[in-house]
Amino acid sequence: MINIQNTILGKIVDRKHEELAARLKQRNLQDVEELAKAATPVRGFANALQHKRPGVIAEIKKASPSKGIIRADFNPAEIAQQYEQAGAACLSVLTDVDFFQGADENIAIARNHCALPALRKDFLVDPYNVVEARALHADCILLIVACLSDQQLEEMSKTAFEHQLDVLVEVHDEEELERALKLSEQCLLGVNNRNLKTFDVDLNTTIRLKKLLPASRLLITESGIATPDDVRMMQEHDIHSFLVGESFMKQPRPDQAFTALFGQPQTV
């Protein structure tokens, strides 16, 4: 397991524990469960991803810790509509406030303006955050193996499935992949090509880890997909699912940036 102390991820996780304590004081788990029950029906995230080739999770992100403001003109509703028209399979919506300038309400805003399912992109540290994701109308959650123990991964994925949420489990290396594979095969697997310590991106990370999986297991490549050549390289290694944010968010028209990178995805 990567040691995340003294990394930006470590700082984020520390902040998330503080945030969790504050949120529990504002609203207990029982109240959040009631909100989750009243949320809009779940849209199948994994199903949508599997039925597009390439299957693209298009990200709605205003800022990042490494780049600062990525998109000053930030309109989640408009971006969601553009992504849907361009052929995205799913959305990824940042809800972290302190590091990514996201907001909880952006999930509902994005979903209300398109028919795509949405991932709550955040750094979840407790089952409370999972139930909260459903209360915010998310269809899928992200579990980052580097941030969580095996027990947390098991408990949080179980909570997600109990609430009809799909689960994307993110790994950075072989050791984390081994841990992720202990979880239900229902979980989607994602490889983040960005080194947590250096922030360098190496697309070969996904290709290397793909070889350790059964051919039937869907794998999502995350971070650093910036050119059609990057996309082709992944497809040549039978990787057809992508999570892309920054490449789209930096451009005036995210839909045009999407088409330039992926062409027109086909339903399969």
From Swiss-Prot:
It comes from the Bacteria. GO terms for molecular function: indole-3-glycerol-phosphate synthase activity; phosphoribosylanthranilate isomerase activity. PANTHER family: INDOLE-3-GLYCEROL-PHOSPHATE SYNTHASE, TRYPTOPHAN BIOSYNTHESIS PROTEIN. Pathway: Amino-acid biosynthesis; L-tryptophan biosynthesis; L-tryptophan from chorismate: step 4/5. Belongs to the TrpC family. It is an enzyme of class 4 (lyase). It comes from Acinetobacter baumannii (strain ATCC 17978 / DSM 105126 / CIP 53.77 / LMG 1025 / NCDC KC755 / 5377). This is Indole-3-glycerol phosphate synthase. The gene is trpC. The keyword Lyase applies. Pfam families: IGPS. GO terms for biological process: L-tryptophan biosynthetic process. It catalyses: 1-(2-carboxyphenylamino)-1-deoxy-D-ribulose 5-phosphate + H(+) = (1S,2R)-1-C-(indol-3-yl)glycerol 3-phosphate + CO2 + H2O. Its EC number is 4.1.1.48. Keywords: Amino-acid biosynthesis, Aromatic amino acid biosynthesis, Decarboxylase, Lyase, Tryptophan biosynthesis.
